[in-house]
């Protein structure tokens, strides 16, 4: 499966967060990309959970249950061209899933309905994959559609045409690259 080599840096993501927070403010709900399940970490660092791969740098979280997104790397910096892993600490049997070959690829996965629902992969894998293949029309937060459209336009995102096939391909190729901490 072909993957775009488009490079999106964390600074691009931060810029879109600030832009969407300004364009779509809310009195009490999450601002910017937080409204679509991307709470950016500043500075990015390994989240430190027993289930977090030792070779990942956490750059965002969904905002609930410690669920977080990390860039696979051997260093201390996010590599935008490296795979992205979601870690679901409460999923004791299978806490990690690859959700993008690159940062751009990851953002494309959720560009139609956000990123929070990825936290359900361990509860109902098939339904979660179907959610991203054929996203529902409704949103919890009425700003989400506009935030997603702004992010898609600003970063030139395109949704995955075959979510089930792409997702399974990523798992088979990249999961073996995860290095778990010694205490897990």
Where are these regions (language model features)?
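Generic alpha-helical structural element
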Residues: 48, 92-95, 140
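A surface-exposed partner-binding patch
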Residues: 1-81, 144-184
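An amphipathic alpha-helical core segment
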Residues: 114-155
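Compact, glycine/acidic-enriched structural inserts
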Residues: 82-122
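Compositionally biased, intrinsically disordered low-complexity regions enriched in proline and serine
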Residues: 25, 29, 69-70, 98, ...
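Short alpha-helical interface elements
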Residues: 84, 128-131, 176
């Amino acid at each position: 499966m072909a993957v775009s080599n488009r490079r999106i840096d964390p600074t691009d993501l931060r810029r879109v967060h600030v832009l969407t927070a300004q364009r779509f403010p809310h009195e009490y709900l999450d601002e910017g990309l937080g409204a679509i399940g991307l709470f950016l970490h500043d500075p990015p660092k390994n989240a430190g959970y027993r289930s977090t791969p030792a070779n990942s740098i956490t750059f965002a979280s969904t905002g609930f249950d410690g669920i977080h997104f990390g860039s696979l790397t051997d260093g201390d910096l996010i590599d935008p061209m490296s795979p992205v892993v979601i870690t679901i600490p409460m999923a004791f049997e299978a806490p990690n899933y690859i959700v993008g070959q690159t940062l751009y690829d990851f953002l494309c996965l959720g560009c139609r309905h956000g990123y929070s629902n990825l936290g359900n992969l361990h509860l109902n894998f098939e339904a979660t994959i179907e959610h991203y293949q054929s996203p529902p029309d409704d949103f919890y937060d009425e700003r989400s559609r506009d935030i997603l459209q702004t992010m898609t336009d600003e970063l030139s995102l395109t949704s995955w045409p075959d979510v089930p096939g792409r997702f399974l391909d990523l798992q088979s190729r990249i999961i073996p690259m995860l290095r778990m901490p010694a205490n897990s």
